[in-house]
Amino acid sequence: MHDAAALHVVEVLLVIGMAAWDARPLLSGEMARRFPRVFWTAAGLIIAIAVAALLAAIYAPALLHLMIVVAVALTSAAAWLGRVNYGRSRGLPPGSLSLQASIDALFDRSFYRNSAAWLGPVFKTLQFYQPTVCVVGLDRAHTLLRTYEDALGPSVQGFSRAIPQGFLRYMSIETHGVYGPMFRRALSSRVVSHHAAAMALAASRVLGDAARKADRAGGVLPDPYLDEMIDEAFLAVLFGLSPDDPDLPQLKSAYAPIARLHISSRPTPAVLAALAGVRQVLTARCARWRALPDAEVPICALSEFAKIDAGMPDDTCLDNLVFIYRISTMNVAGLLRWVLAHLAGHPDWISRLRAELDAETPSDGPALADRIVMETLRLSQAEYLYRRLRNDIGFEGYVLPKGWLVRLCIWESHRASDNFPEPDRFDPDRFLRDQPRTAYMPFGGDRHACNGVSLSNVICRVFLEELTRSYTWSVVGADAVEREFRHWSHWRPSRRMRLRLEPRRDAFSAAGQPARSQA
């Protein structure tokens, strides 16, 4: 009897030990700090398994034996899949499909770069609990996108299900062939540049607010001021809305549930109702504009659709505009945070930009503010593209299986020394020279590439020029980087980053006001 009890104790410990071993990547202190819900769910599962094993040992020893078999099978399968050479006989790329690899990618910004150096430019890993082929090198990415366009489908986020025919970047090739050209025209540089002066006024106003509230020793958190200026710019360019537009409160009220939706989540009935409410506001605006002379209709993306086609904008156009507003405001704010962080470490570029603005002499090639934004996109903001394989394909000597994700590693590819000498150095002047299409791809590289290039660049340029022209400024606390949300989100500078700014007494803002009056 004592021997049987001792055996049961060993069996219980074996079940608990294997469960804890399999879940160990989820039980680290880093997981507890960054993702407490995941940590405590994993810990709770281990406790539940321990309790079940103890009860089985007391009341159902046969069930305990079954638990051991299942635990051994799961642990063995995880170890087998985690081998770097797993699938070599089937032609799969090298790399581990272990949970540990997925967690490493979550916490280590250099994971993909280091993996490519070790395994080669095409390798496999596990992401979102799904097997993924990673491709480093934009020449390879372009070849893959061009050669296997029909075999590469979108990796669709949940919010796209709320939109008839889907979000622009997730549309089928045929559907995108209809809507893509319309959005390119609706978000053209002509439409965006019409709002540049208003953007400068908005930047001047929010920076004045920041300067009044800044503690000269510690500065202010830049996020609220970036968000306000960017929000105003997107509302104007997308919908023709100014801060005093009578439609704005109604649109904001209807939009509130959409603002709370995480883009990976399926839309709830409340979100669908909110989308219908926003659509109603925008449709009413379009109806009023049709009764106006062309000269009185605001120039914006919404009004451009009716010029393209009398039957537009339809629900697909309207819903896409709403979610472009939802997603892109956050992305542009992230880009501007990175611009500030990079310049914080390279104040000589701030001095150069101020000298260029004060002299009012055009650069040879893109303006310095534009080059700073382009270099920031290369070094930090542009990170990845995802596609999903519809069919098995052969690429670079490997088999890429149907159903797997493909991650095109943009951040790592932008740091290739064969395209960018000293690739880790911040050097906006490298964009005085045209970069080959296969070397620089911050907004995507196929027919689904982002249409908001002009809008993003103009917002960032206007803000940066207004800040530098009118203020003496610096940034502190920007050294650390962290995740914005989860595995699929962008990295960002530390949330502790603060902006210090004081008005330049001899400067005038883009709005034509003395900078001193803003403080």
Predicted regions span which residues?
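Cytochrome P450 catalytic-core helices
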Residues: T329-E356, V453-S470
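Cytochrome P450 I-helix active-site segment
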Residues: L92-G95, H342-E383, P401-W404
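Conserved cytochrome P450 K-helix E-x-x-R motif and the immediately C-terminal K′/meander segment
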Residues: A101-G120, E360-E396
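Conserved cytochrome P450 K-helix/beta-meander segment immediately N-terminal to the heme-binding cysteine loop
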Residues: L408-D434
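Cytochrome P450 heme-thiolate "Cys pocket" and heme-binding signature region
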Residues: F431-V476, V481-R495
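Cytochrome P450 catalytic-domain helical core, especially the substrate-recognition surface
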Residues: A19-D22, P93-F107, P131, V156-W289, ...
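N-terminal targeting/anchor module and adjacent flexible "hinge" preceding the catalytic domain
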Residues: H2-P131, G365, A507-A519
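Conserved cytochrome P450 catalytic core segment spanning the I/J/K helices
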Residues: A274-L335
